[in-house]
């Protein structure tokens, strides 16, 4: 890093700033949801749409981000990403209704979807290959600090200012980032193949409509017949994409990816697994505030052990997988996460609050080990010609499954609760208890998929893949 020119180091700082903004936003909002609900005159049971709208937009836009950067230029797209994210943040802060907030989060999600992948692409273009790993470590470090800082910062802002400030703090940072990008970032472009617009639209429509159909009756009052039509339309769009990809060699995601057994198993397991685990960061601060009566700041602080556990486990997960193999690790961590989630609810309802940080630390560790193992299993056997496409599809599936997970969590709360539930009451405890039991079952189910991972998917495979990528 010290050997790089000054202008390149400044460019890396710009990318790091984008990573920080995007990662901070993924965790800072969850702590503020109960306060948002009160301010907007909404039931807390409907506030999951604030999270779903952002994550689903990121999932939809991810496949187009790399192509746009290559075609239009990394500086232009990164600049546009920061501007859209900043404008979305401003409109979020100005929102007076839930619908306005959801629309503003969609705009914010368009910017967020392009920020991280285009940032990675920028680093590839401006840094010599020999220093690429050091540069990526530098720019992703703020992205690791964001989730750690987000819950506590969100709690402080909500408790001592208002929820609007979790969005307003993005504005000065975004203005500085956009100006620096425009003045300092080179605008690399390359010759690109034709973008698969029909395939992109089919996938986007399918994902959006299916997610809407999953929760439309609760959050939007859509009739059952309309929901059935939406579900059928979404499924038809996905099937049409499969037919399109089968006949089109330039499809957005080639079906040749699924000829690799570990990719198919890993992708299916990642989709199912992240539906369950995606519920936890959303549900935990909501339960701590509404179910237990914690203040926003206290609830935010309680999320820090989970992030610390996740960061700490990343340092040893390779050794664990190499020692026990993918199948054992994935089955054990999947079932373990379900048990830890039940332990969290039991400890909370028993009033043993002093144990909650320890349980959340354990939850973060188990979840991180499972995430890392799922990601590596999915990509490790892909041929080099398909590695980039497979990674893009995995990233899209990760975001989609998390949006579905939050949607299902909101649906479960609505199913067991009423439109307005009291804070720290016996009835509210029952609502969250039943919701957590269902969540534990959903979290455990992917173990059936991971049990099919072949026995030879074991030692040294993580290390060898990492060496190949270097």
Swiss-Prot record:
GO terms for molecular function: transmembrane transporter activity. InterPro entries: MFS, MFS_dom, MFS_trans_sf, Multi-R_MdtD. Residues 1-11, 70-76, 125-137, 186-196, 243-262, 307-341, 417-430 are periplasmic. It comes from the Bacteria. Keywords: Cell inner membrane, Cell membrane, Membrane, Transmembrane, Transmembrane helix, Transport. The chain crosses the membrane at residues 12-32, 49-69, 77-97, 102-124, 138-158, 165-185, 197-217, 222-242, 263-283, 286-306, 342-362, 396-416, 431-451. It is a multi-pass membrane protein. Residues 33-48, 98-101, 159-164, 218-221, 284-285, 363-395, 452-470 are cytoplasmic. One of its GO terms (cellular component) is plasma membrane. It is found in: Cell inner membrane. Belongs to the major facilitator superfamily. TCR/Tet family. HAMAP family: MFS_MdtD. This is Putative multidrug resistance protein MdtD. The lineage of its organism: Bacteria, Pseudomonadati, Pseudomonadota, Gammaproteobacteria, Enterobacterales. The gene is mdtD.
